[in-house]
Amino acid sequence: MSLFPFLKLCYNTFMDIWTSLGAFAFFESERLSFRPLIFLDRFDLHEIVSNPQNLQFFFPATQTQHETDCLLVHYFMKEPLGVWAIVDKELDKMIGVVCFEKIDVQKRTAELGYFLNASYWGRGLMTEAVTCLSDLALTAMGMERIILIAHLENKASIRVAEKSGFKLVSRFKGADRYTRTMRDYLRFEKEENCE
């Protein structure tokens, strides 16, 4: 059953994918809120991205606050559509990021990427975030398929994909985008008609 049936009608009538990404710049789940990143997130982001444990499958850790500030502005704020800060509603603290990469408007697909402060691991928060965003994208944003690529050794991300309703579709080898080392990857997909 769709979580956002009235929004699907609205999307089909009025919006394209980019407009819907703008319309859903802010949304919530039970424990989390999602919003565009702002410069005031710089310290919470630095807490996350300066710790290599948080990013071992995403990108290299930053060394200084200045590097984090540059990352924040150039990677997350410069083109904000499809990029959300994950905020713990109880603490009003930015604890992670979830984003769409490789948005294909013609095929109505996007690849989902995310990371979470290690202090919040093991609580089901990333599963909640991925489920909420993927369901919203498939029911109200006009997406037909969401893709999630996980490193084979990233067991936590594989569990998030499975618990969020994604189906494993392939295993492949590829070069890590930062280290250029060959790694094994799993490709998961979630489609509009997935239950």
Feature-to-residue mapping (PLM):
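A short helix-loop-beta-strand connector motif used in the catalytic cores of GNAT acetyltransferases and
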Residues: V73-A85
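Acyl-donor (CoA/ACP) binding surface of acyl/acetyltransferases
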Residues: F4-Q56, V83-E195
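Juxtamembrane/interface motifs at transmembrane-helix termini
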Residues: T64-T68, F76-K78, K89, F115-N117
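Conserved GNAT-fold acetyl-CoA-binding loop/helix
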Residues: Q53-H74
